């Protein structure tokens, strides 16, 4: 059953909740019909590139489905069009759809259609196209082109469910789209909080009795620090991904939410979100349970090949893909028993201290276990003798920083090899959450 057919079938059920109130599947279906009528009035004689501007909401969802159904190309972009001139130019968007809750404006941009070979390839296959951009935190954002028709079809086997879900990642990320399409295919209610602050998320969970919360370990740590666990009593499942989960944080989370099932997820923008399972409760290992995915480990790096991986990049080479379609993720992994894996971190984040290598996540797990530490980031800094040295930036609730610094060093000396012990402990108000955003998303 197609996604659009499912939406029609679920007519009376609530579909999307947010600042606009609650929209039913029937009302969402009517919005999709209006969007399709607007497309018909344009009298387009070929697949066309659209920039879809906005955030999660009824209008943006309606247009995503309408464009996929009609075989067009779409780049979902958060914010407003003025923020994305380079991205709109790169896809040569002929039209801009500026959405806001349940309304939209359809604005012409250029007359000439896009002639990029990847768009032509998808058009020849009769497929719609989806363009997602990498975060671009360290370079120009990469424009990744996906077979949108194939991606949407991958959700057609989902079972109906009444579990209420919450969306944290935006509709311009593969993780945010995965949450959206999973919810729509299951006929569930998807809740969009007013903001991604712990307070607003907790308020949305309490108001709509959210049962499933997809989040990153960093955000889950912020929830604990915010003291809002009492408002999260309705939660039954927390899925986590985007970065390694420190074992010490997982233990704290399980103590704070004893009735919640924790599921580790994994995915990349290039290969999509993968179905996974955990070998046992509380384990930081995962197992891939996806018939559409192949995986292998080469020199401790995870390689993936999936049925829904991207067709290519608009503005970059495919050097991270092998000739036979394997994607080199850049993730360092540890292999466990029974085909399980543990994500240790990004290979590019590895710290080399005098020839001894370590991953930041191992040190972060120890530092986070120290009472008074609410968050931390471990990084390498240049050192004239050892090449690099370990530094940790700490967010703390404790006011006595010297005592906490001593406690952190004592914990590290007790549990870590000498080369892994931070040589400097800095205290700060906040730490960057950008380190892992490039390739991994939650569902």
Model-identified regions with their sequence ranges:
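Conserved pre-ATP/AMP-binding loop-to-beta segment of ANL
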Residues: 11, 112-133, 145, 160-165
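Conserved AMP-binding A3 loop
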Residues: 24-26, 128-156
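Conserved AMP-binding/adenylation subdomain of ANL enzymes
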Residues: 152-164, 172-211
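Gly/Ser/Thr-rich phosphate-binding loop
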Residues: 212, 226-283
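AMP-binding/adenylate-forming catalytic core of the ANL superfamily
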Residues: 213, 306, 332-420
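AMP-binding/adenylate-forming catalytic domain of the ANL superfamily
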Residues: 414-438
